[in-house]
């Protein structure tokens, strides 16, 4: 075969390592880079931008999943359902601000009864009213 095409990997890629593993991330840096290029956000995309964005997305996912796991444990469940995600996001001030206009399917609403709808508390007299 001429031209150096042996059908295998390139000679310099014996220790190939993904950009995600180089950055210590679980989210795919290569896929984020491809989506940034295809999304027409800018003409050019720097090398550090997809790494940073993947790290931010991974952090947000971990934060939401931790709070949702706590909500599931509070409800004595071992599986996170959309209701737990909804409770986690709406009870956290910053996440609620970030995802304020997001609708979560099968998420339900936060339990809340307006103060005016609650029964009035009657003060009890210390002395007995009976004769």
Curated annotation (Swiss-Prot):
Q: Where is the composition biased (Gly residues)?
A: 1-10
Q: Where is this site: Not ubiquitinated?
A: 120
- Subcellular location as annotated: Nucleus; Chromosome
One Pfam match, by short name?
A: Histone_H2A_C
Return the annotated region ranges for Disordered.
Answer: 1-24
SMART domains registered for this protein in UniProt: H2A
A GO molecular function assigned to this protein is: DNA binding
N6-acetyllysine modification sites are: 5, 9
Decide whether keyword DNA-binding is in the record: yes
Q: Which Gene3D superfamilies match?
A: Histone, subunit A
Q: Which CDD domains match?
A: HFD_H2A
Query: Which post-translational modifications are recorded for this protein?
Result: Phosphorylated to form H2AS128ph (gamma-H2A) in response to DNA double-strand breaks (DSBs) generated by exogenous genotoxic agents and by stalled replication forks. Phosphorylation is dependent on the DNA damage checkpoint kinases mec1/ATR and tel1/ATM, spreads on either side of a detected DSB site and may mark the surrounding chromatin for recruitment of proteins required for DNA damage signaling and repair. Gamma-H2A is removed from the DNA prior to the strand invasion-primer extension step of the repair process and subsequently dephosphorylated.
Residue ranges the record marks as coiled coil? none
| PTM sites of type Phosphoserine | 128
Q: What is its main location?
A: nucleus
Q: Which GO terms describe its cellular component?
A: nucleosome; nucleus
The record comments on the domains as follows:
The [ST]-Q motif constitutes a recognition sequence for kinases from the PI3/PI4-kinase family.
Further information: In contrast to vertebrates and insects, its C-terminus is not monoubiquitinated.
Q: How does it assemble?
A: The nucleosome is a histone octamer containing two molecules each of H2A, H2B, H3 and H4 assembled in one H3-H4 heterotetramer and two H2A-H2B heterodimers. The octamer wraps approximately 147 bp of DNA.
Task: Give a short account of what the protein does.
Answer: Core component of nucleosome which plays a central role in DNA double strand break (DSB) repair. Nucleosomes wrap and compact DNA into chromatin, limiting DNA accessibility to the cellular machineries which require DNA as a template. Histones thereby play a central role in transcription regulation, DNA repair, DNA replication and chromosomal stability. DNA accessibility is regulated via a complex set of post-translational modifications of histones, also called histone code, and nucleosome remodeling.
List the protein's name: Histone H2A
Q: State the species of origin.
A: Aspergillus terreus (strain NIH 2624 / FGSC A1156)
- Classification of source organism: Eukaryota, Fungi, Dikarya, Ascomycota, Pezizomycotina
Encoding gene per record: hta1
């Amino acid at each position: 075969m001429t031209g150096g095409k042996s059908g295998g990997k390139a000679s310099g890629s014996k220790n190939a390592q993904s950009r995600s593993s180089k950055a210590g991330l679980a989210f795919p840096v290569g896929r984020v880079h491809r989506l940034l290029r295809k999304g027409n956000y800018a003409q050019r995309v720097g090398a550090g931008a997809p790494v940073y964005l993947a790290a931010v997305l991974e952090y947000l996912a971990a934060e939401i999943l931790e709070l949702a796991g706590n909500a599931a444990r509070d409800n004595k469940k071992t599986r996170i359902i959309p209701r737990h995600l909804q409770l986690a996001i709406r009870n956290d001030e910053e996440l609620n601000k970030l995802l304020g206009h997001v609708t979560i399917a099968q998420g339900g609403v936060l339990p809340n009864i307006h103060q005016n709808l609650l029964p009035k508390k009657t003060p009890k007299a210390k002395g007995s009213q009976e004769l």
